[in-house]
């Protein structure tokens, strides 16, 4: 029996390998192109060295709190997969100040994080500073003060750590802005795989067909240069999905972008099963294939891996809201915008829909005007139905003209297009009411829409 175990293990390994290769065969059907030699140097993100948080009180008993804060901070930072986080030796804080400065100067990390912490009169006070690891330039600093009791000390400490991590490491955070600025003038075909991810986040922030094309081209090259970069495969899956979801840059070579997106997402998850972005891509693929509960379960799994991810929080809010769980979904979107105001305006479409189905047309219009995705038909659908219900016929008619300009067949395909959003039945019915009032439908279409 003992001799059978190696054979069994080999068989299991072979089956797993075959599965990954099969997915890769499907995913790797991306058209190949010449890759500049400069792109063969793969950079997966900058490095961040976290120095131990110093005890600012002079009370040795508070050193334990500072050490625990350092550990919490590193733990929160490593949940983001867009930088390499290193912790300096915890004995450094026992060295003389001059020795500490020598250690800082000696680092090769792109960024250095340092700070102080202490407890004063029932308050925690934490000051954190981010510096350029090479030039020693100060990039960002903030002080966090929170009330606490002995019972809430650990919870408050962890919340401060999470807030610092989001400020620094999340998309559109401090490090993202620094890195994006550094590569802003580079041509797409000269970007590293990590820099392609920066461009993709720029697209997710400003959803336009031009940025979509740039992101797709860059990511297709990135996965050739760096085929084990799970996040790049996941980003490519999400960008490919937008060909069908938003109608951006449809390709005759991809007649079914949603199915292609699923293949890419599955491959990304096979490469890195515990990475949030691949799971987010898989969740989106399930959602677009009409399996909303599988999509939500996958998003929940991704969010459990990084509860500090504002994008995942907003995606969960979007999904719960569209299936009719407004009480659960809307607070998640509001929390996501509170955490990261630079999130895409796309999620305002969900808030607009929330107010619309509850008859608050003024509030719905305020939200819809913030969507800012003019090249997609869906924001104009929102504005058309809201204006119609609010008693603005001229504005509703203008939005109908924009819908017809972007997609002349939308009125014919409206039911199928909207059902792909996995809308709750009463929500779909309210949308149909608004679009009829807006004048989108001809007679036959109007009669059909009454059965939605």
For each feature predicted by the language model, list its residue ranges.
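Alpha-helical protein-protein interaction modules
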Residues: 261-266, 275, 280, 294, ...
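Hydrophobic/aromatic side-chain positions at a characteristic register within alpha-helices
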Residues: 204-207, 224, 287, 321, ...
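Alpha-helical tetratricopeptide repeat
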Residues: 189-205, 234, 276, 280, ...
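Catalytic-center loop of serine/cysteine hydrolases
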Residues: 20-37, 70-214, 218
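Short coil/turn linking the two alpha-helices of tandem helical-hairpin repeats
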Residues: 201-209, 237-252, 289-290, 324, ...
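A structural "domain/chain start" motif
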Residues: 29-67, 74, 189-190
